[in-house]
């Protein structure tokens, strides 16, 4: 467990390796998107198999998932992926983050991004891109406009503050 911010309002980042944290990881979007008529809930069994039981992907791709907690309640989540089949680019190996969901709090986003970056760097990644949920063949990118319409198939949904919170962490959008 990584304790990010000391004190009563502390943020803890916990690897989603047991039943409780995996359940929190899977159900967190329900909290983030409560009351959002444009959000379509994913199939939980599919999400669980994809993130925690995806044996073919795991044969060549290292994947880690974390949940951010504040005062015992889940407030964010993220994954990091490093695919050994992807050749390095001219400026080094690229790692990916994805499945990021969090409350509107800069400290939570900072803790999640830092955790993913540290994990990727420890495995040799020179840079990080995302969000990729979990590969380029799944949902990629970040919704930055038209938040009032449901996503198309294989497209993610986000709250309007995600773009700002990720930019605060030095992550710039590309088109």
Residue ranges and their predicted role:
Residues 37, 170-175:
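Proline-centered turn/helix-capping motifs that create local helix->coil transitions or kinks
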Residues 73-77, 95:
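Glycine-rich phosphate/pyrophosphate-binding loop shared by adenosine-nucleotide-utilizing enzymes
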Residues 82-84:
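A short acidic/small-residue loop/turn micro-motif
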Residues 88-172:
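Acyl-donor binding region in acyl/amide transferases
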Residues 51-67, 76:
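A short helix-loop-beta-strand connector motif used in the catalytic cores of GNAT acetyltransferases and
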Residues 2-53, 93:
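Short amphipathic alpha-helix that is part of the acyltransferase structural core
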């Amino acid at each position: 467990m990584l304790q990010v911010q000391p004190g009563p309002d502390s943020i803890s980042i916990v690897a989603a390796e047991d039943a409780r944290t995996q359940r929190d990881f899977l159900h967190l979007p329900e909290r983030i998107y409560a009351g959002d008529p444009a959000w379509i809930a994913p199939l939980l069994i599919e999400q669980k198999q994809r993130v925690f039981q995806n044996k073919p992907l795991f044969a060549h791709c290292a994947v880690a998932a974390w949940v951010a907690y504040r005062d015992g309640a889940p407030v964010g989540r993220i994954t990091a992926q490093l695919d050994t089949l992807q050749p390095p680019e001219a400026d080094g190996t690229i790692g990916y983050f994805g499945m990021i969901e969090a409350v509107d709090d800069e400290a939570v986003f900072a803790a999640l991004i830092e955790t993913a970056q540290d994990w990727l760097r420890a495995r040799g990644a020179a840079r990080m891109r995302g969000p990729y949920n979990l590969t380029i063949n799944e949902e990629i990118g970040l919704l930055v406009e038209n938040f009032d319409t449901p996503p198309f198939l294989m497209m993610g949904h986000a709250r309007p503050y995600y773009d700002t919170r990720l930019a605060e962490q030095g992550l710039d959008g590309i088109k």
